[in-house]
């Protein structure tokens, strides 16, 4: 099966973004990550930082869900989700590419030529990596990982009604802590 689009979902600190970029480089195709946030910001008029932050939080609370669309129209989060959906589908339609995050696995689930990948690793590997790569020092790395993963899972569940990281929702799951970041990119590129 030829895959025109590869989606990379990932646990925070697992190297998924790096794996996506390396895979795209090996295949000579574009990798979209921060570009999605920039496009959404341009289209909506929201600041890129706001778009990034909102993409990590599921709209919450009883009042938010009970009143958002019925009484007051769509929330900012709903507007961003609609734009995210559009940007991801437009990028996939342009041609072969790698898309990192942004619920692309769900958005493109009915696309026959899409390879859906989930990257994970154990807590020790990820904690060490976020300190080395991002200089995380504000709170314990483990706390930061749990918080970020919890937010990603909640956001994914809210908009997709699917369990984030659940193996059956992906074609391939890879443990970057065991396999290595470079080798993960090699494996994905070989499956393309």
Language model features by range: what are they?
Residues 110-132, 138-148:
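Conserved phosphate-donor/acceptor-positioning beta-strand/loop module used by diverse small-molecule
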Residues 8-24:
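Glycine-rich phosphate-binding P-loop
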Residues 2-11, 95:
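Pre-Walker A (Motif I) flank of P-loop NTPase domains
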Residues 59-66, 78, 137-182:
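Small-molecule kinase domains that catalyze NTP-dependent phosphoryl transfer to phosphate-bearing small molecules
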Residues 41-96:
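ATP-dependent small-molecule kinase phosphotransfer cores
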Residues 30-41:
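Short beta-strand-centered segment that lines the nucleotide-binding/catalytic pocket of NTP-utilizing
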Residues 91, 104-111:
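RNA pseudouridine synthases
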């Amino acid at each position: 099966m030829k895959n025109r689009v590869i989606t990379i979902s990932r646990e925070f600190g697992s190297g998924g973004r790096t794996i996506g970029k390396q895979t795209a480089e090996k295949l000579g195709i574009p990798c979209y990550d921060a570009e999605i946030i920039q496009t959404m910001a341009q289209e909506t008029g929201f600041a890129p930082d706001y778009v990034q932050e909102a993409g990590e939080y599921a709209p919450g609370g009883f009042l938010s869900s009970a009143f958002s669309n019925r009484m007051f129209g769509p929330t900012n989060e709903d507007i961003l989700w609609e734009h995210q959906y559009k940007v991801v589908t437009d990028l996939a339609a342009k041609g072969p590419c790698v898309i990192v995050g942004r619920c692309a696995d769900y958005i493109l689930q009915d696309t026959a030529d899409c390879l859906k990948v989930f990257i994970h690793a154990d807590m020790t590997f990820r904690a060490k990596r976020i300190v080395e790569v991002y200089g995380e020092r504000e709170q314990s790395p483990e706390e930061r990982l749990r918080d970020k993963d919890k937010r990603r899972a909640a956001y994914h569940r809210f908009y997709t009604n699917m369990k984030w990281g659940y193996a059956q929702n992906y074609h391939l799951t890879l443990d970057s802590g065991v396999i290595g970041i470079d080798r993960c990119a090699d494996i994905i590129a070989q499956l393309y």
